[in-house]
């Protein structure tokens, strides 16, 4: 890619035309769409949009599990000039209703499981609801819109009477500062923020990928295992691959280590992108036992190198054996695992970013990365550390540049609080930068917890559910070494009046926990409860001093 902005939709258009007969999207162990077939489906969806009255700039919400047709829905919306609003499929129906309404979406793409829990009357702005597998209009508000469902082939034929080919592609031409999509960081009213991502931010992230991963080109195969609605997965398992002419496989099932390893062995991708949890599980189940068993041999010169090479080769082979490097991001990486991978010379790298930067802030190729760092600042970006000595004293990481978001949708106050007075994005992360420009993160200044697959978990949301229970005075949710734990200050006085001892009270809470978790996304399930003998330490404003309880 050139180092100068080009319309993202025109880049997609050119790629579709150039790779017309190549495979584009597949469901793992399922159907495959060529770039030509993908373009055909997009054109058909554009006809549906036109006939249903969708205009450029209207919002299109997408809430479904990972699937090739999820990508078709997103690309159809983007290339039409609409604004996609990807939503995590784990959100509860009430959350989906809220976000669809908050975003003022006119069209909603869903899968059949999501649709079962939704009530169209709760989403008054929505004109049409479309099932993604198979594509079918499930709900239409007007008779004219209902007519479209039974006449799509006829309407498509009217627009393309002879045939549909590469020369018919003419996608919406975007500009760098224009709003491309809205990505919600949460599903709950009062906590959700619609991150407005520009086309320039998407292009800039794709440009980084083209420079950092030149081996990713037309015909390369990639496995999409991250959540499609997550900015990390959307950018580096879909957008860039479509511009590069790659073949993307969607797992369409829970990405357990077993499923992922089987898919990687079958597909043999040119690049592996995943969250650290996958590697940590592989390390604990397969590598750690070997290391512990051979500790003596690791101390013998010559033998240790042979063992390291054997482990490296076996790990490389188990991940398909055809990739340039493994890119990890979306959550913190266990230092023990990372240092071992570095020691054996395994080709991995760790990037750093956030939804508000679409998502990349720093990155380095595996042969340049420093252990425990997150790389160096990405092209078109700058970072600084708010610290008297950025090399030794941790301070907030602040960023500015092309990747930075336009603001939070309909939330000027939150937008203003996200930037410094001189216009730098406040990331909420603490870090230092060494003399070579490598960023080392030291912790988070925000309350947000990163889930195992990179989802944003806001403890205040979970606490709001807990605090609604009659027996709870106040609560605090923490990440206890990967386990979401609720610290609860119960109503000891009321329990005493009712003759309930601590053990009985704990038993009652454990019985209520499944009902609490039913109100929360699958990635934000509370697994452990601990009682506080007395109230939490508080600030003068009566807020809990969270930092005292972190582990």
Where in this protein do the model-derived segments appear?
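Conserved ATP-binding/catalytic segment of the ANL
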Residues: 391-392, 396-451, 468
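Conserved AMP-binding/adenylation subdomain of ANL enzymes
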Residues: 203-221, 228-312
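Conserved AMP-binding A3 loop
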Residues: 34-36, 180-206
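Structural core segment of the AMP-binding/adenylate-forming
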Residues: 52, 79, 83-158, 482
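Conserved C-terminal "lid"/linker of ANL adenylate-forming enzymes
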Residues: 449, 474, 482, 512-551
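Conserved AMP-binding/adenylate-forming core of the ANL superfamily
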Residues: 4, 13, 21-67, 71, ...
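Conserved pre-ATP/AMP-binding loop-to-beta segment of ANL
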Residues: 20, 150-184, 191, 215-221
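Gly/Ser/Thr-rich phosphate-binding loop
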Residues: 270-273, 284-369, 473
